[in-house]
């Protein structure tokens, strides 16, 4: 990849000038001036997904200039480099090939001259065989009973992705009950184990190195709980499997290495649900549905790799995001799924985006002089409407929003889905067009109120509008369409990282806190006052020790 400071490009300078023209333009006027605006600023993908980006503060010239920025920063060269297996994660000297995990075309993808697809396919075949045995009841616990519950023990990418997908695809789940334990807080594992029978529980320990502090602490607590009932350590192998690459540590734990599912250093944690880390997904919805998830993502991969910039959906969404973040000064983006099954989707891409692009040093090692990754947050609709939409509508912060909804509900209960989707459509309309003072006064007049009677309340009922949104309407949330949607956001993040000249696939920002925690932990084990830190940290530790004594 080329290292190009985006602010030094001619395209960036042109965008700054263009922003001066666009910053006060209202969407009401953009729509009034062009009856075909929706058709020009929307696209349907694979007859499964409609992406409407017409309710943004952009025009055709905006998109042309943003695409010029993508070309000038060599986005297409970077896309080709990723798909070719080049080591674009330079700080860790690694390729970035989550796209290989879902390469349903099975075309060769090489790293260091070696095609990775035979190994990918071998692990998938092993996952399929394992899933069939567990789901069909062939896999038996130490007392001969079939498995009823599966506990995924992981953290970060080893937890957020599988948990999000199994929740999103609950309509496809089988008889197995899934549980996810991530937090090192003992409450998480303790509350989970209270509900389980050791005779019928299978644990998946998800840690590439098998040394992750939170994961291994929880795994050992689960093992201790299991052995209190089972007694014999040989039974561990019937109730624990590993998603790891550390053969020695897995064997030492008591897991049969035949039940160790590997992945590779070119799989980043937050992009790993497509790998063996997704075993909990495959166990929950069945391997055939897991393959459909991979297939949907692969369809979006092919689109991203081949579509011209003006039609490339991940690229368009990424460029619009850069427009708001760097020119309008928007600091956050909200992801708002109007589907309760998708309740963890915002949290998943909170990690996906913020861990990828939350960087202030560029690919040349220089501190940036522009904005990189935004803050990502969100909640399912309509809950959010009764919590934080007030600020989105009438606050002083500009918050671009992605609204996501399925046309077809898995639970067509009465008129619930119609009411849900009426809110979905209404919110984007209200955010875009608002309500003028004249409209408010007219509304009061129709209710028989005079201008004098209502003048004190009118300002509070005015909505400025001009608040940007993207609407992503899915035909139905299926494994295939969910795979497409996840890959859409993954490639949006990649695109922004390339253009903003940062490394999106490392996460050095999580290391310092870990190092300090490892230093502090031994200091908590005795009653001696701590004086080795700053005054605040010393005081906090010493109060903790005093209260715990």
Swiss-Prot record:
Gene3D superfamilies: 1.10.1390.10, Glucose-6-phosphate isomerase like protein, domain 1 (3.40.50.10490)
Catalytic activity from the UniProt record: alpha-D-glucose 6-phosphate = beta-D-fructose 6-phosphate
MF annotations from Gene Ontology: carbohydrate derivative binding; glucose-6-phosphate isomerase activity; monosaccharide binding
Location (main, coarse): cytoplasm
A Gene Ontology BP annotation from the UniProt entry: glycolytic process
PROSITE patterns xref list: P_GLUCOSE_ISOMERASE_1 (PS00765), P_GLUCOSE_ISOMERASE_2 (PS00174), P_GLUCOSE_ISOMERASE_3 (PS51463)
Keyword terms: Cytoplasm, Gluconeogenesis, Glycolysis, Isomerase
Domain of life: Bacteria
Subcellular location as annotated: Cytoplasm
Documented EC number(s): 5.3.1.9
Family: Belongs to the GPI family.
Full protein name: Glucose-6-phosphate isomerase
Species name: Edwardsiella ictaluri (strain 93-146)
Highest classification ranks of the organism: Bacteria, Pseudomonadati, Pseudomonadota, Gammaproteobacteria, Enterobacterales
Gene label: pgi
């Amino acid at each position: 990849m080329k290292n190009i400071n985006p602010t030094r490009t001619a395209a960036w300078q042109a965008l700054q000038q263009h922003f001066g023209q666009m910053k006060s333009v209202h969407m009401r006027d953009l729509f009034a001036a062009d009856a075909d605006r929706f058709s020009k600023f929307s696209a349907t993908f694979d007859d499964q997904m409609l992406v409407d980006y017409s309710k943004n503060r952009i025009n055709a010239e905006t998109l042309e200039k943003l695409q010029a920025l993508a070309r000038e920063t060599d986005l297409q060269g970077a896309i080709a480099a990723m798909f070719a297996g080049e080591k674009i994660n330079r700080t860790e000297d690694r390729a970035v090939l989550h796209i290989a995990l879902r390469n349903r075309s099975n075309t060769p993808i090489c790293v260091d001259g070696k095609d990775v697809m035979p190994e990918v396919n071998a692990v998938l075949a092993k996952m399929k065989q394992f899933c069939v045995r567990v789901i069909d009841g062939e896999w038996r616990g130490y007392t001969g009973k079939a498995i009823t519950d599966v506990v995924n023990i992981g953290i970060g990418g080893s937890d957020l992705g599988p948990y999000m997908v199994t929740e999103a695809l609950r309509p496809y789940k089988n008889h197995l009950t899934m549980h996810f334990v991530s937090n090192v807080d003992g409450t998480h594992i303790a509350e989970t184990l209270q509900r389980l029978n050791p005779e019928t529980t299978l644990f998946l320990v998800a840690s590439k190195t098998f040394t992750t502090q939170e994961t291994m602490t929880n795994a050992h607590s689960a093992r201790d709980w299991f052995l209190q009932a089972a007694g014999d350590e040989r039974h561990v192998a019937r109730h624990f499997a590993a998603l790891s690459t550390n053969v020695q540590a897995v064997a030492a734990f008591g897991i049969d290495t035949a039940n160790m599912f590997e992945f590779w250093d070119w799989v980043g944690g937050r992009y790993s649900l497509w790998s063996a880390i997704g075993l909990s997904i495959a166990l929950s919805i069945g391997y055939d549905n897991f393959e459909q998830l991979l297939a949907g993502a692969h369809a979006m991969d092919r689109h991203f790799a081949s579509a011209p910039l003006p039609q490339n959906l991940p690229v368009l969404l990424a460029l619009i995001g850069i427009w708001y973040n760097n020119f309008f000064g928007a600091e956050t983006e909200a992801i708002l799924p109007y589907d309760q099954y998708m309740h963890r989707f915002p949290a998943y891409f909170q990690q996906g985006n913020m861990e990828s692009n939350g960087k202030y040093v560029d690919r040349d090692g220089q501190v940036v002089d522009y904005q990189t990754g935004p803050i990502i947050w969100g909640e399912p609709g309509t809950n959010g409407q009764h919590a934080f939409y007030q600020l989105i509508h009438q606050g002083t912060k500009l918050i671009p929003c992605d609204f996501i909804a399925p046309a077809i509900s898995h639970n067509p209960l009465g008129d619930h889905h119609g009411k849900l989707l009426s809110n979905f459509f209404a919110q984007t309309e209200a955010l875009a067009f608002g309500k003028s003072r004249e409209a408010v006064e007219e509304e009061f007049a129709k209710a028989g109120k005079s201008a004098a009677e209502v003048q004190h309340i009118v300002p509070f009922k005015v909505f400025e509008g001009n608040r940007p949104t993207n609407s992503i309407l899915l035909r139905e949330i299926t494994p295939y369409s969910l795979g497409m949607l996840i890959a859409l956001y993954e490639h949006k993040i990649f695109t922004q990282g390339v253009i903003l000249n940062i490394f999106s696939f490392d996460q050095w920002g999580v290391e310092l806190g870990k190092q300090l925690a490892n230093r502090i932990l031994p200091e908590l084990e005795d009653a001696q006052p701590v004086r080795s830190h700053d005054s605040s940290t010393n005081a906090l530790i010493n109060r903790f020790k005093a209260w715990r004594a």
